[in-house]
A protein has these predicted regions:
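A short SAM/SAH-binding and catalytic strip from SAM-dependent methyltransferases
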Residues: 108-122
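Conserved alpha-helix/loop element of class I SAM-dependent methyltransferases that forms part
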Residues: 22-43
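A generic alpha-to-beta junction signature in SAM-dependent methyltransferases
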Residues: 39, 64, 86, 133-135
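N-terminal, positively charged/glycine-rich alpha-helical extensions of SAM-dependent methyltransferases
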Residues: 1-15
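A short glycine-rich, Lys/Arg-flanked "PGG" loop and its adjoining helix->strand segment in the class I
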Residues: 123-138
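A structural alpha-helix within SAM-dependent methyltransferase catalytic domains
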Residues: 32, 58-61, 126-130
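A short acidic, Gly/Pro-enriched loop at the edge of an enzyme's catalytic core
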Residues: 99-110
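Class I SAM-dependent methyltransferase SAM/SAH-binding core
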Residues: 45-101
Length: 138
C-alpha cells in the first residue's frame, strides 16, 4: 500500500471531506455510543489515530472530556482542519504513519474510525500499540 499516495489523496479532499463523508460521521457517532455504553466512563488520556478532519475527535473531546487528546493522521495537512481544536491545551496533533510512530505510555484509550483498512499490518500494529495502554486501557 502506497501511504504517500493515500496521504496526497486525502490532502486534496480535505476541504470537502467533512461534508461528503456522511457514513464516516455515522460510524464516529456509533463508535462513541458504544464506548460510552460499554467501556470505562473515564478516559483521561486518549490517542486517536487517523483523525482526518476531526469529526470523531470533536465527539471524543465533547463527550469524554479527556485531560489530553493526542490526534494523529498520516496526512500532515489535516492539521488545517483542526484549528478549532488545537488552541486547547488538552489537544495535540502529531502527523505521520501510526504504524511507525510511538505514542505516550499509559494511554487510557487508543481509538480510531474508518482507518484500519489503510494499514499494511493491523495485527502488528495492535501488538505494538498494546504496550502504550494503561493497565485498564482500551
Amino acid at each position: 500500500m502506497d501511504k504517500r499516495l493515500i496521504a496526497e489523496r486525502f490532502a486534496r479532499a480535505r476541504d470537502t471531506y467533512s461534508h461528503e463523508a456522511r457514513v464516516q460521521q455515522q460510524v464516529a457517532e456509533k463508535m462513541l455510543q458504544l464506548l460510552t455504553e460499554r467501556a470505562s466512563p473515564l478516559f483521561r488520556r486518549i490517542v486517536e489515530f487517523g483523525c482526518g478532519t476531526g469529526s470523531y475527535s470533536r465527539l471524543l473531546l465533547h463527550k469524554l472530556q479527556p485531560e489530553s487528546l493526542l490526534l494523529n493522521d498520516l496526512c500532515p495537512e489535516m492539521k488545517e482542519c483542526l484549528t478549532d481544536l488545537l488552541p486547547q491545551d488538552t489537544v495535540q496533533f502529531i502527523p505521520g504513519d501510526a504504524e511507525a510512530l510511538d505514542f505516550p505510555e499509559k494511554t487510557d484509550l487508543i481509538t480510531s474510525c474508518s482507518t484500519l483498512q489503510w494499514f499494511n499490518d493491523p495485527k502488528e500494529f495492535f501488538a505494538r500499540w498494546h504496550r502504550f495502554l494503561s493497565e485498564d486501557g482500551y
